Amino acid sequence: MGIETVEVWKGNLADVAVQQLLKRVQIMVPLFIEGGVILDLDEPEWTLERWTVFFYYQKIETKEDNPYLFMGYSTVYRYFHFQAATNESGSKKEAKADFTLPLDNISFSSLPCRSRISQFIILPPFQRSGYGSRFYRSIFDFYLAEPETVEITVEDPNYAFDDMRDINDLRRLRALPEFKAIKINGKITPQPEAAIPNNIVDLPALETIRKRMKIAPRQFLRVVEMHLLSSIPKSVRKADELDDSNPKMREYGLWRLWVKKRLYKHNKDLLSQMEKEERLDKLDEVLEGVVTDYVRLLEAYNSRVKIDNFEKLAQGKGKGKGIEGSNGKRSSPSDEDSDSSDGEPLPKRAKV
């Protein structure tokens, strides 16, 4: 058995060689993605240019002619991301008619965009072995370093991908000291019948981190909620009543209020049709489901970190290559259509 490495190669779908590769492998889309659609390669070139395809290989150094073993692939689509023009003071600039259309010197690839992971397939022999996480992190790293990408989103992920994404996003964010410094403001005293305070957590600091890490708003808030919940002891979460004089219980009560605010905003259309008492009961029910799911994900996260740390101690850092261009040269390092807080009905997904 030879030395094993993994490699990620990328190419633009307007490239004929990439099209030929994709033709051979996208037969797997209807087999592994429920409701998945095979990409139409007869689209105009300007449309194909908005697609990037990442191919994932295992390479085993042996005497065989072809040491590469195909493990999976992913497609990413670029959506134009409109950003309101602002001046140095942060206020919007006045529109000026000092240019004419069309602008021949501007290409779509040079404009700010939302890069959306559309299809993501890992073949069964390589599933549940950490390969999917490594592939996801490689794609994310590439777009995190790409100046044109403003946000990295995912199109209609299934539950398995959701779990992998949550765990890896949490791990990425926890590597930032400024993220680990985010705490619940225990000095807040919510007033009965009043709106939930906006300063339970430092929202400006969170937004700065979110934009830097290019994570879509809803996904980012979920990971923040998960991270903050991890500091709450199990005994506090299981308590029948929260004692406000206990700092951790007070913190947990504020956490619950903050999460409820997001859940209500996210499902406002449905909840607004209910009577107040029914609405409050429904929010409590959904919140308990969220807590249960976060606890499950945090346990999976801790298990994954332990496994990765053990592997590093046992065999050193994993070998692998960065993302390669379709021409064989190293390329420069460089959820959803919309991740806004509202728009997705409550019954659609268990994870909210």
Predicted regions and their residues:
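Conserved acetyl-CoA-binding loop-helix of GNAT-fold acetyltransferases
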Residues: 122, 128-141
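Conserved acetyl-CoA binding element of GNAT-fold acetyltransferases
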Residues: 114-124
